[in-house]
Every structure is written in C-alpha cells, then in structure tokens.
C-alpha cells in the first residue's frame, strides 16, 4: 500500500499552481472562480473574508450563506485548470455549522452533478471520499475495508487551519490530512480530465486558503 502511494506521487511534476486570496477584494467572489451547487437549497454565496491567522493572510475564501438544508452542496470551481491526473490540496478552517462543518476538494468536475470529492468533517471527525454521479452522492470505500465503509475516522480540529490533499492517477486515489496518508481508494467512473474546486455542505462556514493544483 505504501509503495503504491509513493509511486503515484512520483508520477507528478514538482511545479504546482497555488491560488491564494491575500490580494483579493473583500466581500466579492475572486476572479477565475465559478459558483455552482449540487441539489437544493439557498444559492451559494462564496466571497472573500478577513482572517489574519490564514496561511497567506489577510484574506481567505468562504461560503457564507448559512442555509441548513442537509443535502445542499455549494461548489466553487477553479476555471483556469483542467487536469486528469495530479494532486489538489487546500488549507481550510472549520469555523461554524450546526448541521455540518465540512471542507472538500473536487476533481474531474464535469458539471454540478458529476465529479469526485473528498471531504473532512469537523462534526463527524472523519474523512470520506465520494463520487457524485448524475446528482447522486455515493461513498467510495477505502482500500482494504468493506465496500460499504464510510471513509476513515480522524480528528478534524475546529477553528484552526488544517490541510486536505488528494492525489489521483487513473482510477487510483490517495487521501492525506495534515501531511499524513489516511487511505487509498479506486474508482473509474470519471476517467476524463476535468476541473477542480472546493465544496462545502449545508450550513458549514469554512475558510479556505492556498488552493494548490498540479498535474496534467
């Protein structure tokens, strides 16, 4: 398992595109991003907010609409890059949320109803990988666990900055939290290149910074 993970990581070039928000205008959606949403609920509102504790202060990107609809999944899609195989990471801080406190990374995004997503949840204290296919969110179990397994349990500290990362090559995925490899998984539903982006759920107020993309 460790050998496979190392081989997958070595496949990718060292250069990466790092998208920070330190120079963005507060209260607005930064350029280069498109807002979308899976399922129902109030429209997402992604905007720049101030956080001096951020990795690249003073500004971060947040989804600030607090609709508590449980099946509401706001998306912010980075339009500049389309990749099939590579890595995506983001720094995040789970700030508030009574229904959820979630932060997710999207890759091989086709549209708001078809993409892969891995998310960390500070209320459930777990990390789970899904595919959203035709609007239906389905769990992809970690390798070595039963097919209906729901990700892995792991402490997700609230109100402090953490890093979520996923590496993907073909149908193989590796998920990391704060630099620690958590699990591997596999799926071949979406094989073509797609966009990458950010994801939250329901009333999550989550801050994001240093969104990083590499691959081809």
Each model region followed by its residue ranges:
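Intrinsic-disorder/low-complexity, polar/charged segments enriched in Ser/Thr/Lys/Arg/Asp/Glu/Gln
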Residues: 16-20, 85-89, 161-163
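Extracellular carbohydrate-recognition regions
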Residues: 16-39, 209
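Short, aromatic/His-centered strand-loop micro-motif at the edge of beta-sheets
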Residues: 135-165
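Sec-dependent N-terminal signal peptides
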Residues: 3-13
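Secretory/extracellular carbohydrate-interaction modules
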Residues: 26, 63-137
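Short, solvent-exposed beta-strand-to-loop segments that form ligand-recognition rims
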Residues: 171-197
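Ligand-recognition surfaces built from glycine- and aromatic
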Residues: 19-20, 190-216
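Extracellular glycan-recognition surfaces and repeat-rich motifs
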Residues: 28-62, 71
């Amino acid at each position: 398992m460790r050998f496979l993970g190392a081989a997958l990581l070595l496949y990718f070039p060292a250069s990466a595109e790092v998208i920070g928000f330190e120079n963005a205008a507060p209260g607005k959606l930064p350029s280069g991003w498109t807002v979308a949403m899976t399922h129902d609920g109030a429209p997402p509102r992604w905007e720049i907010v101030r956080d001096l504790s951020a990795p690249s202060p003073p500004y971060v990107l947040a989804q600030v609409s607090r609709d508590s609809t449980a099946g509401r999944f706001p998306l912010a899609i980075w339009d500049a890059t389309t990749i099939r195989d590579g890595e995506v990471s983001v720094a995040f801080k789970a700030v508030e949320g009574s229904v959820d406190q979630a932060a997710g990374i999207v890759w091989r995004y086709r549209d708001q109803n078809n993409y892969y997503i891995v998310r960390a949840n500070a209320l459930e204290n777990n990390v789970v990988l899904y595919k959203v296919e035709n609007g239906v969110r389905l769990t992809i179990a970690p390798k070595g666990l039963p097919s209906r397994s729901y990700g892995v349990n792991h402490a997700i500290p609230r109100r402090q900055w953490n890093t979520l990362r996923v590496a993907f090559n073909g149908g193989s995925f590796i998920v990391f939290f704060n630099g620690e490899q958590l699990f591997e998984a596999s799926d071949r539903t979406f094989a073509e290149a797609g966009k990458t982006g950010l994801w939250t759920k329901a009333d999550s107020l989550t801050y994001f910074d240093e969104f990083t993309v590499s691959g081809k």
